[in-house]
């Protein structure tokens, strides 16, 4: 389904949250056992639709497929065909990831100017602009400077993420902003999170909702298979990491 491009204000700014939601966010890294947070209506409807159109227009997507090694202690990249040929228990993850983002801003880029401007505005926000920096400071201990890694992903039929933890990384938490306006409940692609005590939380990728997920030892997360016959579940993932950490791919 095509959606008209809506103009967005220059500055991306999340909508104000209810007191209970703010409390849950402040406790995100301190709660024991861990608790993810799922917020509907993260941006204004106008900004979410405009950003979604810009992300869907990204021209360069690459299938990112990985399989587990024999002892399931690490993964390695493979081709999509190798992933399909692997046994089900070896299939760690497969979905499309946007590549060559910097080239979109080169002189002569075919990426439409309005999308370039909107994407640039979003990077100001997601790349530790003042609004996001102030919000993240509420969720972390004083004196812990953070930076962010941003990834754009989409899912085709059957794409999924297997159960894993990312606890070996330096990531403190991940924000996932879902930008598929055509998402329906039976499309699948649900983010699952299991805490240290074995309790599961399910977060459907509803349009303009945001999942905020702590990354810690003893917790795992996954994405259920994408059931739709169309490409969808367009997602912006923002991983918050200490400034000394080495950037890595957002899972």
Language-model features, listed with the residues they occupy:
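Short, conserved, surface-exposed binding loops centered on an aromatic residue
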Residues: 138-144, 164-169
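Non-heme Fe(II)/2-oxoglutarate
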Residues: 3-17, 26-135
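Hydrophobic alpha-helical segments and helix-packing faces
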Residues: 125-129, 148, 168
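A short coil-to-beta-strand element that immediately follows conserved catalytic motifs
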Residues: 142-151, 187
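Phosphate/oxyanion-binding loops and surfaces in catalytic or ligand/nucleic-acid-binding neighborhoods
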Residues: 57-61, 139, 182, 243
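Short, charged/polar N-terminal "headpieces" of proteins
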Residues: 20-21
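Catalytic core of Fe(II)/2-oxoglutarate
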Residues: 2-13, 153-171, 179-251
């Amino acid at each position: 389904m095509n959606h008209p491009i809506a103009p967005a204000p220059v500055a991306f700014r999340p909508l104000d949250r209810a007191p209970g939601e703010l409390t849950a966010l402040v406790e995100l890294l301190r709660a024991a056992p861990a608790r993810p947070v799922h917020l509907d209506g993260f941006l204004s409807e106008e900004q979410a639709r405009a950003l979604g159109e810009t992300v869907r227009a990204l021209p360069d997507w690459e299938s990112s497929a990985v399989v587990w090694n024999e002892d399931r202690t690490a993964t390695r990249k493979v081709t999509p065909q190798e992933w399909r040929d692997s046994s089900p228990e070896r299939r760690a993850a497969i979905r499309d990831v946007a590549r060559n983002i910097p080239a979109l801003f080169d002189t002569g880029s075919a990426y439409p100017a309005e999308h370039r401007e909107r994407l640039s505005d979003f990077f100001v926000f997601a790349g530790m602009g003042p609004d996001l920096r102030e919000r993240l400071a509420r969720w972390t201990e004083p004196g812990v400077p953070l930076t962010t890694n941003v990834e754009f992903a989409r899912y085709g039929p059957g794409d999924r993420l297997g159960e894993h933890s990312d606890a070996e990384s330096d990531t403190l938490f991940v924000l996932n902003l879902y930008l598929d306006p055509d998402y329906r409940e039976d499309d699948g692609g649900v983010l699952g999170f299991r805490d240290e005590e074995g309790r599961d939380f399910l977060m459907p990728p509803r349009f303009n909702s945001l999942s905020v997920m702590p990354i810690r030892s003893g917790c795992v997360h996954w994405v259920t298979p994408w059931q739709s016959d169309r490409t969808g579940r367009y997602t912006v993932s923002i991983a918050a990491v200490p400034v000394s950490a080495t950037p890595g791919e957002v899972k």
